[in-house]
């Protein structure tokens, strides 16, 4: 949205303010968009994550935005590192912010460094039909260039045809959160990106009056983990058509 007082609130000033107050306060005071917490998700669980060595694998899932701007009018970019252990999904750390494409690419390497050699990490990036030209024309060349500087990361595009964002988050994540089976890493509680993720969960509503790019990213990671678990379990099978990713980097 746009500020209700653009003459006073320049883009630079708005971004500086947005970084220092909550999304709820920012939307209400500067965007004339009052929000309430807990309409769908009442509480987000923080807890200790198991050592990454205990995981079969981890997934770094990224939700890009086609914007290459750091201003508040653009969508949030997101990239989070998730794992699964003993029936619970864990969000170890991640990033959620308005950033340039160059910074977004760096996030993948930051998550690689966080995981180090403790666990195999699978890297995915959302790539629906609308995003595909941008992914091929912008991100693939950027990842190729960064690979020459910092090493190769194998990234797979998630090309599935997704249901609407709210329904996916409510249907796939709300039950997990309510049952205590989706946990945010308490060691990262002061991380502003993780705080932003918690707030987006709490402000989720059917009208989508506030950003939900973070929860959308987590839903993507959980979905990928579930697909991988189903293939690892002996005798497991999947009903439906398999989607092949033909644009693996």
Regions found by a protein language model. Name each.
Residues 35-39, 70-71, 117-118, 182, ...:
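Intrinsically disordered or highly flexible coil/loop and linker segments, enriched in small
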Residues 15-16, 33, 37, 78, ...:
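Mg2+-dependent endonuclease catalytic cores in nucleic-acid-processing enzymes, primarily RNase H-like
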Residues 1-64:
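ATPase catalytic-site recognition across NTP-hydrolyzing enzymes
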Residues 214-216:
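Conserved RecA-like P-loop NTPase helicase motor core
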Residues 222-249:
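Acidic two-metal-ion nuclease catalytic site recognized across multiple nuclease folds
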Residues 62-77:
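An active-site-proximal beta-strand-loop segment
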Residues 207-210:
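C-terminal interaction surface of TIR/SEFIR-family domains
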């Amino acid at each position: 949205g746009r500020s209700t007082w653009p003459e006073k609130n320049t883009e630079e000033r708005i971004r500086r303010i947005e970084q220092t107050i909550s999304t709820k306060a920012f939307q209400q005071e500067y965007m004339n968009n009052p929000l309430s917490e807990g309409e769908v998700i009442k509480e987000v669980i923080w807890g200790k994550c198991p050592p990454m060595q205990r995981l079969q694998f981890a997934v770094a899932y990224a939700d890009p935005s086609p914007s290459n701007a750091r201003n508040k009018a653009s969508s949030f970019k997101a990239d989070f590192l998730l794992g699964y252990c003993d029936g619970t999904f864990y969000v170890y750390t991640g990033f959620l912010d308005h950033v340039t494409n160059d910074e977004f690419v760096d996030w993948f390497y930051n998550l690689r460094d966080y995981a180090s050699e403790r666990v195999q990490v699978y890297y995915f990036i959302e790539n629906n039909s609308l995003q595909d030209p941008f992914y091929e024309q912008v991100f693939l060349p950027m990842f190729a260039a960064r690979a020459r500087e910092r090493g190769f990361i194998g990234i797979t595009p998630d090309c599935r045809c997704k249901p609407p964002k709210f329904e996916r988050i409510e249907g796939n994540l709300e039950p997990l959160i309510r049952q205590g089976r989706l946990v945010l890493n308490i060691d990262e509680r002061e991380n502003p990106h993780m705080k932003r993720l918690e707030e987006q969960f709490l402000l989720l509503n059917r009208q989508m009056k506030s950003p939900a790019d973070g929860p959308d990213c987590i839903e993507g990671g959980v979905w990928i983990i579930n697909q991988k678990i189903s293939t690892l379990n002996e005798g497991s099978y999947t009903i439906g058509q398999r989607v092949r990713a033909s644009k693996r980097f």
